[in-house]
């Protein structure tokens, strides 16, 4: 921590760093023009940056330059159990590698406070119609995840600076919003803005509090944990003015789905957005958090709101200590982070969105930005006539209706609205269709408390929306098994079946293998679709049922009134609910425990936790990038779900066959996500998504075949993807992937990069990369290359029979040459952009990846190498 510009913070016993003065010393009047994001980035530079580099770094912010890397030091790391556990498995493996080289493994610890929340591993096996669902699902979770939880329990005592929130307590982002973020930190006698990275792409949810909080891959999180600065260049900072107010009956879900479509079209990929204006002022933190949560769905890095009266009200509502709330207000007003101080901020680009334009909305059938106003569902071909045969499910059957996800369960207005629509439906005798698997999985225990306080929990339970978990569940693809009779009918009749959920992602195949497509909706709409029973139902016009007098009941007859929603929220949501939930939860993590052995005792038969191989053989050092054959040629919009799916493992998959050989019963296969601590299981998930289109595999008419398929070259044999990977691994064949635009969008899972790296992929050439996945590729020693504008796999007529090599001096964003050697003997040289974006990334790449770099640097510092 530096000493220059450190001053007493008026009205407190703390100091602060006077960022305004530091900026004004370089350019008078500049601070008032800085956006909110730049002010926070500047503060941490003044506090932590090497004093000799400070002026040049601050000039990047003042002059809006992007030609110099500067450090970012996040105050905290938050992890969920999948990527967090994977990161800690990597650190445990790093300890083994250090010990093998003669270093002290006990010295490998996170130096930045790290919070791990177990929220991703519970599947909804018992539905919300089962009164014992919560207990049953938790028992199954514990049984299936014994190996994982054994390891996680070891980390509590083996590593310093790691807090673990055990399963059954809520979702990482909602806990971060409601409790973990102080908004303003106070450590070592200094107050400064809270900042955070998290191993999940929805980490920006806390941006709603004015906290820069961004999603990163597990590899980058490990780097931050170990105290390394995250090097960055000034991002694009885009102002988004929200005008008007939401119309009556419109939810924050409707708003965010409309905004997601709008921002996707405006191409804000990688940008930091700052929302302001009368519309932003009118939104509660619950509404703001819904927008910030879906940052990755519109491709941005952050979605900031300023600290204002709404922020203070929320901190009080969620039971923060009075002293902490006062500190947030004092600090924000004194340092120019209060909303009123941002009226002079200048943006290089400003977008405007009118909240009054928002209608009731679904998103689907395959993307969160596929915005569908409910008034136009018939026009869009989603709603339409269907035949209802006695005893059979209809076309478009809604087999899953899930109130799920921190995106929506963190907003009391949404949850109360769901309770009220259930109450109104129950009064009129409406019921859930029998084929609909319904569930309620709040991101916080407080949700159940205030629904009970409002007498709405029993209303939801009557319709089958009992609490199944306090975890991610269906939103994360952990929707659990269907009733076997329903699953068999879907197969036998080849039925088009769907899911409706209040989640944030609906990529094909994500929610359930039998839900061919999925739609995102507000919690009250999810309840309505459970009653309707099919996506073919025109939700605004068709009759949901008939009242006791035989009158048709439509959506407008049961939709709750805004005034009643607000009155119930005001009366039923109380600070003591948050305190009674979180004080005991965090007290558990603070109890002192005896230190564990610094080296983990790996279980050799485990299919969940295994010593990683990243410090061995070909995983170390820079790749040659010669003689590479394509593993796949891929279209636009390849997601990390395509690259490494998260949903249930089926027996006929490569991972399922492996687990069967290892003696795991099929009912305990669990999800792909839960096995990511074992590379032998997880690497078999690479490209295992049945919705994949590999353009190297075509039918006799030349049409691309769907499935986890590959073509082994040079013999041209079509196989399942894993068999192709195994074949190439045996041959020690270096591989390349050719792809379209927006490669790697979606979840921040590092296994989307680890899987291809272990398969032998040395480079990926695409028209564009999503930010987190590109960083993960670098972290695994895989070279990301970008075609120049106008060049694509189509213009180059790439068919997969080629071999490739890359030539040129590797440096940040350098132009390199991709040489294609065609099967007919011809060659073609193509300029490509090296997407190692910083000098630090070049250094990591040349070491073979971030984990290999850690080991090198640690041993050098210890003198053991």
Which residue stretches match the model-derived regions?
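Mobile "lid/hinge" segments at catalytic clefts and subdomain interfaces of large enzymes
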Residues: 37, 187-329, 337-338, 414-417, ...
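Segments forming glycine/polar-rich beta-alpha architectures that bind adenosine-containing cofactors
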Residues: 597-668
């Amino acid at each position: 921590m530096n000493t220059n510009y450190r001053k007493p913070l008026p009205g407190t016993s703390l100091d602060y760093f006077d960022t305004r003065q530091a900026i004004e010393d370089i350019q008078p009047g500049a601070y008032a023009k800085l956006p909110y994001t730049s002010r926070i980035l500047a503060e941490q530079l003044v506090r932590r940056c090497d004093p000799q580099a400070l002026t040049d770094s601050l000039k990047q912010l003042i002059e809006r330059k992007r030609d110099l890397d500067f450090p970012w030091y996040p105050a905290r790391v938050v992890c969920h159990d999948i990527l967090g556990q994977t990161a800690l498995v990597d650190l445990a493996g790093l300890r083994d590698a250090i010990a093998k080289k003669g270093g002290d493994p006990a010295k490998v610890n996170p130096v930045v406070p790290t919070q791990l929340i177990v929220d991703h591993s519970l599947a909804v096996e018992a539905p919300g119609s089962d009164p014992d669902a919560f207990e049953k699902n938790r028992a199954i979770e514990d049984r299936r995840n014994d190996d994982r939880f054994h390891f996680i329990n070891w980390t509590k005592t083996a590593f310093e600076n790691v807090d673990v929130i055990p399963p059954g307590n809520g979702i990482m982002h909602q806990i971060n919003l409601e409790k973990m973020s102080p908004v303003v930190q106070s450590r070592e006698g200094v107050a400064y803005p809270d900042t955070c990275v998290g191993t999940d792409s929805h980490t920006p949810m806390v941006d709603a509090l004015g906290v820069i909080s961004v999603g990163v891959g597990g590899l980058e999180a490990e780097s931050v944990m170990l105290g390394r600065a995250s090097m960055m260049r000034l991002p694009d900072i885009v102002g988004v003015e929200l005008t008007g107010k939401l119309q009556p009956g419109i939810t924050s879900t409707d708003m965010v789905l409309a905004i997601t479509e709008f921002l996707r079209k405006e191409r804000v990929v990688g940008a930091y957005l700052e929302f302001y204006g009368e519309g932003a002022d009118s939104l509660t933190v619950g509404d703001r958090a819904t927008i910030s949560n879906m940052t990755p769905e519109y491709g941005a890095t952050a979605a900031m709101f300023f600290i204002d009266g709404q922020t203070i009200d929320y901190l009080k509502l969620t039971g923060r200590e009075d002293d902490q709330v006062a500190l947030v207000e004092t600090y924000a007003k004194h340092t120019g982070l209060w909303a009123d101080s941002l009226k002079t901020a200048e943006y290089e680009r400003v977008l405007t969105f009118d909240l009054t334009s928002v209608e009731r909305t679904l998103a689907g059938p395959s993307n969160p930005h596929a915005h569908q106003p409910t008034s136009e569902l018939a026009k869009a071909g989603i709603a339409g006539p269907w035949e209802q045969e006695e005893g059979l499910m209809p076309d478009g059957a809604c087999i899953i209706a899930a109130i799920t996800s921190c995106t929506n369960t963190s907003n009391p207005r949404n949850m109360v609205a769901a309770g009220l629509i259930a109450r109104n439906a129950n009064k009129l005798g409406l019921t859930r269709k029998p084929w609909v698997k319904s569930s309620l999985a709040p991101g916080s225990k407080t949700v159940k408390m205030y629904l009970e306080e409002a007498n709405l929990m029993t209303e939801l339970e009557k319709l089958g929306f009992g609490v199944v978990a306090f975890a991610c569940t269906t939103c994360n693809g952990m929707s659990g098994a269907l009733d076997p009779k329903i699953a068999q009918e879907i197969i036998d009749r080849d039925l088009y079946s769907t899911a409706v959920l209040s989640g944030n992602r609906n990529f094909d195949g994500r929610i359930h293998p039998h839900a061919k497509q999925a739609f995102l909706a507000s919690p009250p709409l999810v309840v309505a679709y459970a009653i309707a029973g099919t996506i073919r139902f025109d939700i605004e016009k068709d009759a949901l049922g008939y009242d006791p007098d035989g009158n048709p009941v439509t959506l407008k007859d049961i939709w709750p009134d805004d005034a009643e929603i607000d009155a119930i929220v005001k009366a039923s949501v109380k600070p003591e609910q948050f305190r009674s939930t979180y004080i005991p939860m965090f007290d558990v993590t603070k109890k002192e425990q005896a230190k564990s052995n610094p080296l983990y005792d790996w279980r050799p038969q485990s299919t969940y936790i295994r010593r990683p191989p990243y410090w061995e053989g070909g995983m170390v050092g820079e790749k040659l990038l010669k003689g590479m054959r394509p593993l796949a040629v891929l279209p636009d919009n390849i997601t990390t779900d395509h690259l490494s799916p998260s949903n249930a493992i089926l027996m006929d998959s490569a991972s399922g066959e492996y687990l069967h050989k290892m003696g795991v019963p099929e009912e305990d296969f669990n999800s792909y996500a839960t096995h990511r601590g074992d590379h032998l299981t997880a690497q078999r998930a690479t490209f295992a998504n049945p919705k994949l289109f590999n353009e190297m595999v075509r039918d006799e008419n030349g049409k691309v075949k769907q499935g986890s398929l590959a073509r082994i070259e040079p013999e041209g044999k079509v196989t399942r993807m894993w068999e192709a990977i195994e074949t190439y691994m045996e041959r020690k064949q270096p591989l390349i992937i050719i792809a379209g635009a927006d490669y790697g969008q979606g979840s921040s899972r590092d296994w989307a990069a680890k899987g291809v790296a272990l398969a032998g992929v040395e480079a990926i050439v695409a028209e564009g990369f999503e930010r987190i996945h590109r960083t993960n590729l670098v972290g695994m020693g895989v070279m990301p290359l970008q075609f120049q504008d106008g060049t694509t796999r189509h213009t180059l007529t790439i068919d997969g029979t080629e071999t490739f090599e890359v030539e040129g001096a590797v440096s940040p964003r350098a132009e390199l040459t991709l040489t294609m050697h065609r099967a007919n003997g011809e060659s073609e040289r193509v300029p490509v952009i090296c997407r190692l974006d910083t000098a630090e990334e070049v250094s990591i790449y040349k070491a073979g990846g971030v984990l290999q770099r850690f080991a090198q640097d640690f041993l050098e510092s210890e003198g053991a190498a």
